[in-house]
Amino acid sequence: MRPAAISIAWAAIALTAGACASHATLPSVRFRNQPAVNVVDDRRDVPSPPGGREPLIGEYYYEGYFRRRISRALELRPAQRALGVNALDEVPDSTWFENRIGVRDLSPDEVRAGATRVGSPEGFAPFTIRSSKAAGRAVGFVATDTRGEKFLLKFDVRGFPEIETAAEIISGRLLWAFGYHVPETHIVYLRREDLVIAPDATTKDELGRKRRLTERDVRRALRMVEIEPDGRIRVMASRMLDGKPLGGHPGEGTRPGDPNDRLPHERRRELRGAYPVFAWIDHLDLKIQNSLDMWVTDPANPDCHYVMHYFLDFGKTLGWMGMHSGDLRRGYAYTFDPGDVLESFVSAGLEARPWEARRAPGLRGVGIFDAHTFDPAGWIPAAPVYAPLLLADRFDRFWGAKIVMRFTRAQIGAAVDAARLTDPRAAAYLVDTLVARQRATDATGS
């Protein structure tokens, strides 16, 4: 045998012997055969309300459109997979998310009820107005019914009957079934005499200064809302959330002072994976102000407090934004989109765009919401301000798409039924369109 071959043989023998001798010192296997985590322990006591500053709306859009887009590009960060998943790449239950339709079959009645806990305030008039908010054409009153339950009353903008109130109800039910924490909402019909102003009711002027709410303020506000010929007013009543409001959750980082909030929000699967369901319902108005963190008391232990995370304000879904603004690009381009402007300039406006074929169906209660131009993978919100969606990858989108595909026609129909649309054709159109958009989501997997 050649010397080289002899050396190799002896080396192999030595390695084998060494491996056998050290077998007893090898570390244990890293992965154990045990159940995947299904519930996150994020309800540990937070003795006092956490801090955190919610940015002004102008500041927020400046950050999203300009500063963070530039700084994020300069950071040259590699793509990072989402956190907050278990060994099966699924999202456990937490203060952010609760698995519902993704893990069990919900009955149509469950979807129709959504987040209902105390029930509709209809039949519990008069409503005592405690405060009002009026921003532009958006009108809202915080009022209590005769049970003492407090609701935010929101209305349809004059000239757009049933669209915004129906969208709030339908999308809220679908998002609740998907797994998100949302407020309890109901459609209520009332009359002007059902609204009573409390002696200490307040409002704010254009400069944000608080003052007493007057009858004149209420009359002026109601002139901007849709009122039926018989004097009835259609209202979306959203029950005020329990606890102390902390403002919306930031799109990046964590909330200061909340020890349970450990994962950067931009890397949470339940936030990044919302892309398919938001595209499905055309949830364009994504911003920090349309989420709300609440410092709550544990129902089973009054000495324990923690933060619950909610999404809210879905009235601009289901094509309302495109309908109200007359901007057919909504969902296909940002409201301010230099790239889209440049493309139009270079092509001299001659290139056909998919959104040019969009039309409202001409049905009461339905906005510009269709399936034939819907691109699930190309849909974008109104502004590039919500970081989790901007960073969503194919794994996040696949996770969300799987849950969207769990909805049956009967469950979707139950969500639409809760909106109490007066035209049966409108309800049928919305169900058909949501099913068609769902199938498009299935075809792309995102």
Set out the residue ranges of the language-model regions:
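Conserved kinase catalytic-core segment
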Residues: I163-E168, H249-D340, S344-A348
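Sec/Tat-exported extracytoplasmic proteins
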Residues: D145-R147, F178-G179, F278, Q438-G445
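Low-complexity, highly charged intrinsically disordered N-terminal segments
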Residues: G64, R68-A113
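Bacterial N-terminal signal peptides that target proteins for export
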Residues: M1-A9
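Conserved ATP-binding subdomain of kinase catalytic cores across diverse folds
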Residues: G114-G251
